[in-house]
């Protein structure tokens, strides 16, 4: 068939709008689409069962469990000290927040007092972790919407934070640096200069990110008015973190239920009004600026405090210092028994909640008086926030679903645990 004949044949075929199908008139058809679990936009092994009318989302059902590791059950077979390393593996983008929530709960059970130097160091490190986590969110969110430059810039600054974590703990992500009663070891001498260098450049880098996105017409087109939720629905669905604050609710545990002395720091709780993807973006960008401010205050406090204890002096909880272990057989025996048998909190339960980068993270521990927890449960913000996805997605295009997932910033290790 010649080109001319092919064109003539194609022109003779009626357009789809001219084809009548009487049997289907008035019948609404929908399609069920499986999105994931292996899909880059789901930010992990998340499967979404999406019902579509054309390209419009009628409903969506998250299907979770592909990354279940049984961390809560595994912790029941570990002593309280050894369980710290497992908390890193839930929200692997903010492991220090998980460490903090867990050790605060155990310290409540024990009635343990933590040295001021350790408390201030905890605040400084979790705020650096918040910035690092938000940088991953920003880079991947922008990449999902085809803004690749922001992804590269964000990971440039995140690398600097991970270098600080490596300097402090020897690990870049799974730090396991917080201990029941304080810190694993003291901050190194180089820590002050490394943090100061990062804080000096970070405000300007946030300006760069905002210059690329905030007034970008394509970014605005893909985010403004998409996935909006009001405060009443957000509260009913248990939404916390930037998602809740984007609806106008100034709920931040660092202010409303302060821990680690957050009530003594000066910072604002960023909020917005429309509750859409764009507002969630604005809230997180403002949060990074507030975290920089908190880090500056904490760094100055560390300078004012100077060298001092970084671990509780209660020998029933903390091992003897290494200087004693090398000189005293009794200290060596005590160290051995503490790490092999563990300490035994009194019977009871304790709950400790912190404001993680994704929202309200809580650890609930039940003690039966033994050296191992009877039950550990995490209130994971990613798990709770994910249930708001169907509410936000209905009526939007399937392409908007990609942006919606990114705006919730879920971590599947925390969802499935």
UniProtKB/Swiss-Prot annotation:
SUPFAM superfamilies: HydB/Nqo4-like. Keywords: Cell membrane, Membrane, NAD, Quinone, Translocase, Transport, Ubiquinone. GO terms for cellular component: plasma membrane. It is a peripheral membrane protein. It is found in: Cell membrane. Belongs to the complex I 49 kDa subunit family. NDH-1 shuttles electrons from NADH, via FMN and iron-sulfur (Fe-S) centers, to quinones in the respiratory chain. The immediate electron acceptor for the enzyme in this species is believed to be ubiquinone. Couples the redox reaction to proton translocation (for every two electrons transferred, four hydrogen ions are translocated across the cytoplasmic membrane), and thus conserves the redox energy in a proton gradient. This is NADH-quinone oxidoreductase subunit D 1. The gene is nuoD1.
